[in-house]
Amino acid sequence: VDRYGSLLLNHKTYIDAGHDEYWSGQQRTNVEAARDAGVNLMFWSGNEVYWRTRWGNAYSADGTPYRTLISYKETWSPSASIDPSNEWTGTFRDPRLSPPAVGGGNPENSLTGQLFKVDDVGSNLQAITIPYDDANLRFWRNTSVANLQPGQTATLTKNYLGYEWDE
């Protein structure tokens, strides 16, 4: 999709089917262009389009292009860009060190419709409480949550959702 984005226009739908968090700036530009041209987009997992990356040549003697995925995760840098290139490789949403014109400040939900929320590896996630107001969502059909009454809540088991999810 990064190199041959125009091929997306040959299709009615683009399906992103799994934990696809590392995207190059050109990949995102191409998917946005396809969307703007009428291609339907489907994102079937969480934590997509999160880290902005770039492609580099292989480290082998032949230096084959597009063989090395580069991500300095500059969002984790406290105050300065650490990637030696001028291309931002932090999160798409981070505007601190990279304005939208060069790759930052453009959150993933502006493309996917959802925002990555939790990355809680190695800790004990707390139980999740579902209020009555959410009980009628389709997700809860045929579960005990769907039977909540006004003022009631349901509590999911600790660690139920895993350690990464979107909002």
What are these regions (language model features)?
Residues 65-167:
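Glycine-rich, aromatic-lined ligand/substrate-binding cores of catalytic
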Residues 59-62:
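Short, hinge-like loop/turn segments at secondary-structure boundaries
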